[in-house]
Amino acid sequence: MPKLKTRKAAAKRFKATGTGKFMRRRAFHNHLLDHKTPKQKRHLKTKAVVDRTDEERVTLMMPYA
């Protein structure tokens, strides 16, 4: 059986944790930041855990993570 390929787009966006979960960046922290409060921007800077409903899809895209 051939080796499975990693989806490079997913590899750039997600990082596996030691427990097997995946971390992701938050949306809405790219541009149009003038009207957002400093607290909101600070919160958007932090990483988030991928939801359990999406974990299987990310795992399929990154088989060796």
Swiss-Prot record:
The keyword Isomerase does not apply. Keywords: Ribonucleoprotein, Ribosomal protein. Belongs to the bacterial ribosomal protein bL35 family. GO terms for molecular function: structural constituent of ribosome. It holds the Pfam family Ribosomal_L35p. InterPro entries: Ribosomal_bL35, Ribosomal_bL35-like, Ribosomal_bL35_CS, Ribosomal_bL35_sf. One of its GO terms (biological process) is translation. This is Large ribosomal subunit protein bL35. The gene is rpmI. HAMAP family: Ribosomal_bL35 (MF_00514).
